[in-house]
Amino acid sequence: ILTLTASLFAVLAPAQNLISSGSPLYKLPYKNTYVMQTLVAENTFRTAKVEKPKPGTFEQARKVLPSPYWEGHQKEIEMYWKAWQIGLKNVCQPLDDSGFVTSYISPAYNGNIFMWDDAFITMFCRYGDRFFPFQKTLDNFYAKQHPDGFICREIRADGSDCFGRYDPTSTGPNLLPWSEWLYYTQFGDDNRLNKVFPVLAAYYKWLKLNRT
């Protein structure tokens, strides 16, 4: 998916990023072994200002969200609305000094953000984009990208990675481009695509180097 995206869109002009690999942000317990990925310098999420939007009530959301019609399947429709109700209750505010840059939906069980979970939930939540910017949930992963392009698949609410980048369990299937591509095909948001492209390209290069 990322290869397809890369073939369709040009990389933006570099944007300056001043977070060094020696920053306390990464809390390295070992010698600095980062091999710098130049595309990370274009990752504007790493130095973005924090935003903390709050969603409205479920009653307000129901007036905006798509209302399904499925004759003879009232129970399924009730489940649909219940899913939205639960989802809105799981929108969290970023903690101070966590390095997260925006409010996010957190469907996980332990307060952490999971790359897989949030990739899939944003695929669903894009239908509620007029009510709340759910897609920005993924911005918090991008904000935590390491200087070599690595992004941990699970990150605690305080912003710390759950796994070191040399741990083979620190990554999984790269679902981020899938979510972003679906969002783009629905909304045609060129600005967002241009912002996430260098981030995803840097992560793809890290995966290619370290997981193949």
Where are these regions (language model features)?
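Short, well-ordered helical secondary-structure segments
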Residues: 2, 101-103, 108, 174, ...
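Bacterial N-terminal signal peptides
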Residues: 2-11
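Hydrophobic alpha-helical segments with strong N-terminal bias
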Residues: 8, 101-102, 162, 173
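Hydrophobic alpha-helical elements and their junctions with loops/disorder across both membrane
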Residues: 10-14, 90, 94, 184-186
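Low-complexity, Ser/Thr/Pro/Gly-enriched N-terminal "stalk/linker" regions
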Residues: 16-111, 136
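Aromatic-rich carbohydrate-recognition surfaces in CAZymes
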Residues: 111-212
